[in-house]
Amino acid sequence: MITDPISDMLTRIRNAIKVKADKVDIPASRMKIEISKILKEEGFIKSYKIIKDKKQGIIRINLKYTSEGDSVISNLQRISKPGRRVYVSKDEIPHVMGGLGVAILTTSQGVMTDKECRHKGVGGEVICYIW
């Protein structure tokens, strides 16, 4: 049984990148779909597709690589975990890798990047960092 589905998603992506896989399948949930949407908007993945099955559905993420064959994603780091939640106010939103990376937060207005949170003036729970 998976106790932290978001960590499982990030680990599956990390493992797929290590073996230079073109795509990775992840069990779907609303939160994971929102995270996939942000990864696509920020240019970390080529695309994602939701595949219906008899259970919860599957998200198929097509990974993105440079012309040299290196992954666009250098690293993914889970911040807020079930055993230790991490919340930040609008003034404490972190800059990942000096602005080169992205922090994904879940707020009262939905899942968004650190840049969107600063623009809208909202804080929330820091889900992960991606760079």
UniProtKB/Swiss-Prot annotation:
- Gene Ontology terms describing biological process: translation
Kindly state which keywords UniProt assigns to this record, in alphabetical order. Answer: Ribonucleoprotein, Ribosomal protein, RNA-binding, rRNA-binding
Q: Name one GO molecular function term.
A: structural constituent of ribosome
What stretches pass through the bilayer? none
Please verify whether the record's keywords include Ubl conjugation. Answer: no
Gene Ontology cellular component list: cytosolic small ribosomal subunit
How this chain assembles, per its entry, is: Part of the 30S ribosomal subunit. Contacts proteins S5 and S12.
Main role? Answer: One of the primary rRNA binding proteins, it binds directly to 16S rRNA central domain where it helps coordinate assembly of the platform of the 30S subunit.
Family, according to the entry, reads as follows: Belongs to the universal ribosomal protein uS8 family.
Q: What is the name listed in the Swiss-Prot or TrEMBL entry for this protein?
A: Small ribosomal subunit protein uS8
| Species name | Thermodesulfovibrio yellowstonii (strain ATCC 51303 / DSM 11347 / YP87)
